């Protein structure tokens, strides 16, 4: 084993995995440091909302320092992404320090709002009146900023950024779910298992299949018939949209509650229109998921920059003029790919959620299946990241000559 670790080809990947394990150890330790005892927490029956929070690295079963998870950070990234979407050139000219400060300031503001909402939603009223609510908010905000810092460090020195933290949070949430007795026939259970397997195959298809757009490469002078093509994944945004959409939905709910509580202190915490046991709440979440999936995919593809690269290199698409025509052509292709990928993921998540409205006695099992699907999707992305590092490590001695 020691000999294997000393091999130069895989030294970097092992260091990154070890660093990620250290980050996860801190996260697990912090998520077990309770601020409020379990007896002082309100019992909520909206189990999918708790599951949704866990998909952002949070936990509302107990109030701990990492209860908010990465939700405020993901929401701030969404807001900044949508603001910069219309002017990508200005966004690309910003320094990393400018982007960093904007993200952190916005994350801080959103953390305060979500902390206020979580305390009033999940902590007993008696405990809220007894304790110093501002001190509790300060602890939650500090924990969130620490977790964001850990995720940022893992992006630089570890594996797959915030995804390992979310993966551990989902596993922890799945282990806490109680499914001692399943009120369903063997045929229904078998159908659920088959549907989950089919869904996992579809997700694997989404990750592995790519759309290829052939173009004429002026630098390709080889005698072979090898074609050059522009490749995009079916869902360019990947699994990050699942975390971002949940984060946006939680922020929407907490933001509305925060604004209403300013004018009416006795406002009810339960908002039926934004709950997962109502068709309106599920529909709102799925619309957010679909729109964010599309816009994030378009943001990552960046057709405007790609058309400029084609203009500089002299490469072109057959029958398409360089410049504005190329940009319009790429926008047309990008819209098709991004809407298709976003709609496919939304349908995969939406069908089980709507199904819980018709068979509420199987809601826990269906929620468990949804979490399993999200877990596998995130695992595929993490595996893809590890494979990329292994690929670059394999050719490190060759690539070092050119950078």
Curated annotation (Swiss-Prot):
Keywords: Cell membrane, Membrane, Protein transport, Translocation, Transmembrane, Transmembrane helix, Transport. GO terms for cellular component: plasma membrane. It is found in: Cell membrane. The chain crosses the membrane at residues 17-37, 63-83, 105-125, 131-151, 157-177, 186-206, 240-260, 276-296, 339-359, 362-382. It holds the Pfam family SecY. It is a multi-pass membrane protein. InterPro entries: SecY/SEC61-alpha (IPR002208), SecY2 (IPR014269), SecY_dom_sf (IPR023201). One of its GO terms (biological process) is protein targeting. HAMAP family: SecY2 (MF_01466). Belongs to the SecY/SEC61-alpha family. SecY2 subfamily. NCBIfam families: acc_sec_Y2, PRK12417.1. Part of the accessory SecA2/SecY2 system specifically required for export of possible cell wall proteins. The central subunit of a protein translocation channel. Component of the accessory SecA2/SecY2 protein translocase complex required to export cell wall proteins. May form heterotrimers with SecE and SecG subunits. This is Accessory Sec system protein translocase subunit SecY2. It comes from Staphylococcus aureus (strain bovine RF122 / ET3-1).
